[in-house]
Amino acid sequence: MKGALALLITGGTENWAPGRWRERFTRVCPERPVALIGDDAIDPLLVRYAAVWKPKPGALRQFPKLEVIFNLGAGVDAVVADATLPDVPLVRVAVDDLTRRMTEYVVMHVLMHHRRQGYYTGSQHNRVWAPKLQWAARDLRVGVMGLGVLGRDAAQVLARIGFDVAGWSNTPKSVPGIACYAGPQLGEFLARTDVLVCLLPLTPQTRGILNRKTFDKLARDGKLGGPVIINAGRGGLQVEDDILGCLDDGTLAAATLDVFGTEPLPADSPFWAHPKVTLSPHNAADTDPDAISVYVAEQIAAFERGEPLQNVVDRKTGY
């Protein structure tokens, strides 16, 4: 009998419900036992693999023969924060479907700011016909923070459209067609950025990086009348009081936010009704769960053939 797959899944939308994941993995892994922990009985000694989403701290210690952990989402901060996490490879999801969806989201919102869609939506509501001068994409400087798989793809698609694109990452990266900055060059990167797109992982080093100090360094001479931020990374990357304060005093012209420190976003949050904020419910890259389950099944099969795992997380860096 092949090594069992344990599912440890907390919360999620209907499509991410734990029972739905059991159905998917039973379908794509018909040759191995699949157990939804908390519902299904299984001998812990049989479990070789775990597919997880926001597992409770310490939950994986019950499997002494665990060989690989698969995180079902792109962000692994909730997993690596567990001090008791077994010392086995942690694999993050990196399917093409997720990358395409994130790029769609980023490109859509950069274009909406570039083409002043917020202004025209307001004009429509007020029945005002008042076109504004429109600049070319080459006149807008977009800066992408985070040059992993998602950031690289979004940056390159934006560049193909014609935007002036640069990227920043903690360690040096090279992306064809993109001006790349790293580490201590953050200030230089921010100074040439009109629209700041954040796709960083959440680590101790990046927590709270979207703050007033960062926003103060953004370009002030751009075509949009002030800098704009787009955060589709993690809620912990942003200091929300700083965002609100900077929107109110003009340090920021607008913000698009897909993630928040508390989710679901509380009904009394000022973000809901702020005229300079566009928000979405953490679904910028809501990946097809069927694609994720196939990805995990293929990784397990390759691992059992002796092939190396792909997209293994570095525990020290958190990505």
Regions found by a protein language model. Name each.
Residues 1-47:
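N-terminal glycine-/charge-rich "phosphate-binding" loop or analogous flexible N-terminal tail
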Residues 42-43, 59-62, 188-192, 270-271:
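Structural alpha-helical scaffold elements that stabilize or flank donor/cofactor-binding regions
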Residues 48-124, 135:
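Phosphate/diphosphate ligand-binding glycine-rich loop within oxidoreductases
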Residues 54, 73, 198-201, 233, ...:
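Glycine-rich, N-terminal phosphate-binding loop of Rossmann-like dinucleotide-binding domains
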Residues 89-93, 97-105, 119-120, 263-319:
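C-terminal helix-to-coil terminal segments
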Residues 120-153:
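Glycine-rich NAD(P)-binding loop of Rossmann-like domains
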Residues 160-177:
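NAD(P)-binding Rossmann-fold cofactor-contacting core
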Residues 172-270:
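Rossmann-like adenosine-cofactor binding region
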